[in-house]
């Protein structure tokens, strides 16, 4: 059981929009240049094999996004894997979405992401290349309840001399959350603001594939596909499925420090998996730095 590099915690866009809304800051359009840090599941050997151990390798993720004052946004990000055995730039993401933050009683939003993977033997392959993600938080109460829905789908084709193998896959996840944002003004200077958001999240869903879906804080090796005997001229289509079930509960601490146009956002998560072979309590750390224009 490992953690994926895309967490179910708040995105930078959501943190910024929530902070702007809470402080009733004047709405404006922005270009945001950012870089993230974290760990990604990767193979620990030069030979890709289902029996090899999966380890966590450090990555950095530069990104460029545009946020319109209406709530629409679009962005592109890339991922560079340190200590890679093959191509270090293993992934590119294209995202577009909409966040609605103008109502003081709730927050909601929806986004679509397309994932492009390079042919790297470092990271586990997946047919999941598209994602729809939606969230809703009711913030009239001191403790804010929220729900998120996450659906990913795609296919991956492998053509040989006499066969064409097509992997078709999808994953669906539901997240229930409780959180409360704390805002502190003028912590280190008169121009800075700190947003601290602890949350408790309960995740249910399928875990068919390694994936970068936003709900995939917890990655488990899916059951191995059955070996299919190849016949000349045949096109083989197959899928891999797991049940919709409770996957994990976590406590996440999001800290976001704003000073001028600069934002620093570390995050720490402790989680307890309910499925997979390893169900011990585990944790991971991610961080992000961004500058808005």
Residue ranges with predicted function:
Residues 150-265, 269-275, 291-293:
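Outer-membrane beta-barrel transmembrane domain signature
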Residues 32-38, 65, 75-79, 109-113, ...:
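Transmembrane beta-strands of outer-membrane beta-barrel proteins
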Residues 62, 94-96, 132-134, 176-178, ...:
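Membrane-embedded beta-strands of outer-membrane beta-barrel proteins
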Residues 20-30, 101-108, 137-145, 182-197, ...:
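Short loop/turn motifs that connect adjacent beta-strands in outer-membrane beta-barrel proteins
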Residues 280-293:
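Outer-membrane beta-barrel "beta-signal"
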Residues 39-60, 76-84, 239-243:
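Surface-exposed strand-loop-strand hairpins of Gram-negative outer-membrane beta-barrel proteins
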Residues 9-34, 43-51, 189-191:
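Outer-membrane beta-barrel biogenesis signature
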